[in-house]
Structure formats: C-alpha cells, structure tokens
UniProtKB/Swiss-Prot annotation:
GO function term, MF aspect, one: unfolded protein binding
KW Nucleotide-binding (keyword) present: yes
Function text: Acts as a chaperone.
Source domain of life: Bacteria
Sites bearing Phosphothreonine, chain numbering: T173
Gene: dnaK
Classification via SUPFAM superfamilies: Actin-like ATPase domain, Heat shock protein 70kD (HSP70), C-terminal subdomain, Heat shock protein 70kD (HSP70), peptide-binding domain
Skewed-composition ranges (Low complexity): 578-598
Family named by the database record: Belongs to the heat shock protein 70 family.
Identification of the protein by name: Chaperone protein DnaK
Inducing stimuli: By stress conditions e.g. heat shock.
Pfam families: HSP70 (PF00012)
Length: 608
C-alpha cells in the first residue's frame, strides 16, 4: 500500500510527516524548514507558497494569509484579479506540501490524513476534505489536532494507563482535549475550545498598541496604510517570539510612512510585562475551555497525569504560567509543539495502512447535533463528546392536521433555541399521507462518520418512504465545483512544472555558455583550432537563441554546443594524457639511471 502522509494544515504554519518504519518523521520543505508558512502569493501568473510567499507579503498585495479562519464559510478572497474560495487557497498549500513530500519519498503521494481543530464544525471539516480533494489527495481521515498530538506523545507509552490534557493554542484556533491512554487505545473523553482564539490575536494586540502609540506621537493612523500594516504584522510576530526568550525587545521600522516634514520611523521598545498586560484577556479566555473539558470528562485536576502543550503560541510565557495555574501541573515538554500534530497524523496514516498495529483511536464529536422542532426549539439527537463514528434515531410527528410534508432543519451547537445554533442544512420529507396531527411517525436518524462528517435520514414509518442527505452547508462546494477546482489545480501544477523546466533550461544555457567560454580561452594557442572554431560557432548560435528567447531553439542549440564542447574537451584530455605519459617516461629514465648507480658498491681496502 502506498504511503499515507500526515498533514497539519495550520492557520499560520503547516507541516507534513510520514511514517518510516515505526517512527514518524517530519519532512523538511525545499528551504530546509520543518514547518511551512500557510501563505499563498500570486505574482506574474505564478502561484508562490510558503516561505517565499511570506517574504513578499509586505510588497505584494496579492498575498493571502490565515485562510484557515475562513474555512467553512462562503467568504472569498480576491487576489491575482480573481476570487478564490478558502478551499482553493488551502488546496494550494496542500499541493505544495504534497509536492515536497513526493520529492522526499521519490514516489507519488495520493492519500493523506489531515488534521483540524477539535472544535471545527461539520462545514469546516467538509471544507478541509474538499481542499484535499482539489489538491489531488484522497483524504483517508480527518483527525482532531489534539488527538493527533496525543497519538504522537503516547505511541511509546502504550503499556501505561494515563489521562492527559492536551492544550492546543495554534495560530488561529484553541482546543483542549482530555484523553485516556491505555493498552494502545486512545480514547477522547471530552473536547472544548474556541475557534476564534490563537497566536494571530496576540499579534493583533501588539499591532493595535503600536498603531495607537504612533498615532499619539505623529497623528498618523498606520492601520489605514496596507503596506505599513503588513510591516507591523511581521514586526509584531517577531516581537512576540522574542518576548518568549527575553524580557524586552526593540521594534524598529524605518521609513514606515511619511508626514509633512518628510519620512517617519517607528522606534519602540516593548517589555514582556507590557505584552502580558496587552494580552491578559486572551490568556483568560483559555481558562474556560479547560474547565469545560474537565467537567464534560467528569474528572478532577488531580486525576490528570500529564499536560501536553501543542501549537507555537504555547511558547508564550504568560500562557505557560496560566496552564500551570489552571491545572496545577508543570507541562510536559517532551514533544515539539510545532511538529507533534503532523507526526500524529502520520501515525494515524500508519494505523490505516496496517503499518502501526494495536492502536485504536476513539475520537468524539465536539458539538451537539439535532433538529429544529415546534416553537423554534433545538432538539438534540447526539450530545457533544459522543464517541464517533455513531448513529442515533428519534421518532417525531407532524405539527398540523393533514400535513403533507415535514421540513428537517439540521443544526449543530449547544444553545436551546434553533436560531442561536449553526445551520448545517435543510431538507424535506414529502408525500406524507393525510392524518391528524401527531399520528404520522417520522424517524430521524443522524450518522456521524469517523471524520466527524454528518449525514441525516428522515423516514415515514407508515409508508417506508425516506429522504437521505449528506450534510452540505450553504457554504459548501458542489461536486461540479470541486471537479472544476481540481482541474484548475492540475493545470496550475502543469504550468508550474513547465515554468520550472523553462528556468532550469535557462540556467543550463547560462552555465554552458560560461563553461565553454572558459574552455575556449584556456585552449587558445594549444593547437586544436578545428575543435575550438566548431565550439565557438555553436556558442555563438546558442547565444543568438538565448537572445530570441525561443525555448525549442535554445534546447537544440544547447545540445549542439554540448557535443562540440565535448569534442574539444576530448582533445584537451588527449593532449594532457600524452603530456603526462611523456613526463612519466622521462621520470622512468631518470629512475633507471639512479638504479644503475645504486649497483656500484663503495668498499674500503685495508692493507695488511
């Protein structure tokens, strides 16, 4: 069975891993980095992903960041003169990760396990699966990020029984999961979180502070200047990271804008104490989900054996202190918070292929599921933290006499009224025979698969007629749209490959011209004019083809030059070999003379 890669598709950074033997290994990107910025740029018709895209974010307005926060919505982003869905942008990131994983493995990759925040709803999970499909990946499993982290942490501890709390604060989302580990079973007991809390929010607090201070001093609002704002974002992220290691950092942004008197510079120092003060409310927001998860799991703090930190934002000292204060435990630092999720996803890939034995993953649904009933009430069929996959049925009836149809309004959430929860979809069961109110028996069945994706069936028990749908939110993509996007992605991949081929050819031409000119110069006056003239002629023809920019012509002329240059090199080699042989002959003669002299022995004659 071909390899299944594990992908952590993050808000700010992503990572890809693969199982090698029994070890999960992070695959470094072409720049040698173990994580890749989740950034996409468009320039001159080219799609740029990762570190290169992040570097040009300041100067290139066609740059998309933190697209994960829009997954599961109908919100599109404008770039490159087009509008893109969040799924398409995410697919570009996935395609890039897939590409360098293939380069590392030396084989095609067609399957992946992709992680999502535990608190992602059905629409967000479906959007992630669609992004994988657009990128040319068969998504074998959607796994919750904290669960994947627990897999990576617990793989070498399958003989131990312990309860762990995973505290996952990423770039844009926050999750807390409580798991029980024992005998190779990873059982998620409860999960809670906040999809609108992450490292980006900590950066924003610094940005807001810098903007306010600069406005106070100079009367100019930097938040209205796109380029200045991007520079502020980069500076804020760097300052946040610096303050994890030092107690004070300097923020220096020369020529940030211009005033009436000329250019203005931003020079400011930020202390860790000030940063903690600015972000106090964000740190406070992490506490409620911790308490919620513990309550749902029915556990006290004393029953938690280990606390695992996941996500780059858990390096913030105030966050670490808050975790210690809330759990009463020193966090376990045996895992890399940036890499552990992708590693866990790769392990789950190994479970699917059978390379990892005796491991069972029991995940849960993060939010309750149900339907709207009379009076706009939300009636739950499946409670949050139910182990998945699962199925649950309940019988309902009509609300009016002779009602010919029922509308099934499917919802996800925890609020008592339907209007306050997330609509997953609507469908209708028709042709119900005329009968007094309350007589028809309508059975509604919810199914949640191992990926947390929902399907709903409504059945009239009297007529056995049923209506079945896999939930597709209003913000979801149709199969036709996914197919079109897949074709676009494939076309882009072909265009990118062609562009790379062009660049490689041009580099090869430059190298050949340089090497041949050097050889011609070195062989001047050494007696092989025929070969030198042929190489010079081929060189001139290649230069002319290079000037014209005709790739086919360049390729043909490059082959011709290589042939002539090789002939010249052979002559040079023959001459050098002959010279060496002659030199060895001279040395041999001298050695013989020396040997002959050695045969004469000096002796002493003693007269007696």
């Amino acid at each position: 069975m071909s390899k299944i890669i594990g992908i952590d598709l993050g808000t700010t950074n992503s990572a890809v891993a693969v199982l090698e033997g029994t070890e999960s290994k992070i695959i470094a990107n072409p720049e040698g980095n173990r994580t890749t910025p989740s950034v996409v740029s468009f320039k001159n018709g080219e799609i740029i992903v990762g570190d290169a895209a992040k570097r040009q974010a300041v100067t290139n307005p066609d740059t998309v960041i933190s697209i994960k926060s829009k997954m599961g919505t109908s919100e599109k982003v404008s770039a490159n003169g087009k509008e893109y869905t969040p799924q398409e942008i995410s697919a570009m990131i996935l395609q890039y990760l897939k590409g360098y994983a293939e380069d590392y493995l030396g084989e095609k990759v067609e399957k992946a396990v992709i992680t999502v925040p535990a608190y992602f709803n059905d629409a967000q999970r479906q959007a992630t699966k669609d992004a994988g499909k657009i990128a040319g990946l068969e998504v074998e499993r959607i796994v919750n990020e904290p669960t994947a982290a627990a897999l990576a942490y617990g793989m070498d501890k399958t003989d131990k029984d312990e309860k762990i709390l995973v505290f996952d604060l990423g770039g844009g989302t926050f999750d807390v999961s409580i798991l029980e580990l024992g005998d190779g079973v990873f059982d998620v007991l409860a999960t809670a979180g906040d999809n609108k809390l992450g490292g980006d929010d900590f950066d924003q607090k610094i940005i807001d502070f810098l903007v306010a201070e600069f406005k106070k001093e100079n009367g100019i609002d930097l938040s209205q200047d796109k380029m200045a704002l991007q520079r502020l974002k980069d500076a804020a992220e760097k300052a946040k990271k610096d303050l994890s290691g030092v107690t004070q950092t300097q923020i220096s942004l020369p020529f940030i804008t211009a005033g009436s008197a000329g250019p203005l510079h931003l020079e400011m120092s930020l202390s860790r104490a000030k940063f903690d003060d600015l972000t106090r409310d964000l740190v406070e927001r992490t506490k409620t989900p911790v308490r919620q998860a513990l309550s749902d799991a029915g556990l006290s703090l004393s029953e938690i054996d280990e606390v695992i930190l996941v996500g780059g934002s858990t390096r913030i000292p105030a966050v670490v202190e808050a975790v210690k204060a809330e759990t009463g435990k020193e966090p376990n630092k045996s895992v890399n918070p940036d890499e552990v999720v992708a590693m866990g996803a790769a392990i789950q890939g190994g479970v699917i292929t059978g390379d990892v034995k005796d491991v069972v993953l029991l995940d849960v649904t993060p939010l309750s599921l149900g339907i709207e009933t009379m009076g706009g009430v939300f009636t739950k069929l499946i409670d949050r933290n139910t182990t998945i996959p699962t199925s649950k049925s309940q019988v309902f009836s009509t609300a009016a006499d002779n009602q010919p149809a029922v509308d099934i309004h499917v919802l996800q959430g925890e609020r008592p009224m339907a209007a306050d929860n997330k609509t997953l979809g609507r469908f209708q069961l028709t042709d119900i025979p005329a009968a007094p109110r309350g007589i028809p028996q309508i059975e509604v069945t919810f199914d949640i698969d191992k990926n947390g994706i929902v399907s709903v069936k409504a059945k009239d028990l009297g007529t056995q007629k049923e209506q079945h749908i896999v939930i597709k939110s209003n913000d979801g993509l149709s199969e036709e749209e996914i197919d079109r996007m897949m074709k676009d992605a494939e076309a882009n991949a072909e265009a990118d490959a062609k562009r790379k081929e062009e660049v490689d050819l041009k580099n090869e031409v430059d190298q050949a011209i340089f090497a041949t000119e050097k050889t011609i110069k070195e062989t001047e006056g050494k007696g092989f004019d025929t070969e030198r003239d042929a190489a010079q002629s081929a060189l001139d023809e290649l230069k002319a083809a290079q000037e014209s920019g005709n790739l086919d012509d360049m390729k043909a002329k490059l082959e011709a030059l290589n042939e002539k240059a090789q002939a010249l090199a052979v002559k040079m080699y023959e001459q050098a070999a002959a010279a060496q042989q002659a030199a060895q002959g001279t040395e041999g003669a001298q050695a013989n003379d020396s040997a002959n002299n050695d045969d004469v022995v000096d002796g002493e004659f003693t007269e007696k």
